[in-house]
Structure formats: C-alpha cells, structure tokens
C-alpha cells in the first residue's frame, strides 16, 4: 500500500517527491513530501490529508506530514 499512496501523492500539484513510512500494522507513521515553491506547504498539506481520507480511508495527524520545498522542479542527487 505504501507505493500506491506515494504514487497518488505524486499527482498533487507541485509535489516532486514523496515517501510514506508505515509500521508493521500498516498504520502511517510518517509522510515526507518534497515540493517546488509554486504552492504553499499549507495547501499541499490539505491536499495530502484529503487524498488519504478520500482514496485510502486513512486519517493522519498533520504533525506526521513533513513538507520540504526546493527551488526548481527536481531534486538533484550526486
């Protein structure tokens, strides 16, 4: 289920990366999002919460969701 949630989160406008961490019972422990600067973190957070509830029937405390914004539209790795 982790991969399907991550793939769905990638459909959110401005999101360029996502990682979902679940415990052994399938409960979401952490969500990490990387986005560009076109939308505010608050807007992205609300979209994440809405998708989790509407598509996956999971409610997550907003404190478990972290959003890092980067300039540009991709994360560079070296």
State each model region's role:
Residues 3, 7-32:
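Short edge beta-strands and adjacent turn/loop segments
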Residues 5-8, 44-52:
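Short amphipathic alpha-helices in soluble, non-transmembrane regions
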Residues 1-6, 37-40:
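N-terminal start-of-chain detector that recognizes signal peptides
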């Amino acid at each position: 289920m982790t991969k399907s949630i991550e793939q769905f989160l990638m459909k959110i406008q401005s999101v360029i990366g996502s990682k979902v961490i679940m415990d052994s019972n399938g409960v979401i422990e952490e969500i990490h999002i990387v986005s560009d600067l076109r939308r505010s973190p608050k807007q992205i957070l609300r979209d994440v919460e809405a998708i989790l509830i509407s598509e996956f029937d999971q409610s997550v405390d907003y404190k478990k969701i972290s959003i890092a914004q980067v300039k540009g539209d991709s994360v560079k790795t070296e």
